[in-house]
Regions:
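Short arginine-rich
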Residues: 49-59
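Short linear motifs in intrinsically disordered/low-complexity regions
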Residues: 21, 30-31, 50
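Short N-terminal "domain-start" leader segments
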Residues: 1-21, 53
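Stable alpha-helical structural segments in soluble proteins, enriched in small hydrophobic residues
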Residues: 44-48
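A short, exposed loop/beta-hairpin motif centered on an aromatic-Gly-Thr core
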Residues: 29-43, 58
Length: 59
């Protein structure tokens, strides 16, 4: 019997740490694959999105 393909579900999370510090994570099933810290929410979202697209383009 053939194995069923299970697509990966990746998501970007942006988490407030302090008023001037935000953590971004690219996660699969609540497991962080890549993470980083930024000083604004907008920058954290952009960096998280960029990391997600780099992972997707790598295959």
């Amino acid at each position: 019997m053939a194995q069923r393909y299970r697509p990966r579900l990746l998501e970007v999370k942006v988490i407030p740490i302090k008023p001037d510090q935000w953590e971004w994570q690219v996660c699969e099933d609540d497991t962080p694959l890549v993470m980083g810290y930024e000083t604004t929410r907008e920058t954290a979202q952009i960096k998280g999105d960029s990391a997600l697209f780099r992972l997707l383009s790598a295959g």
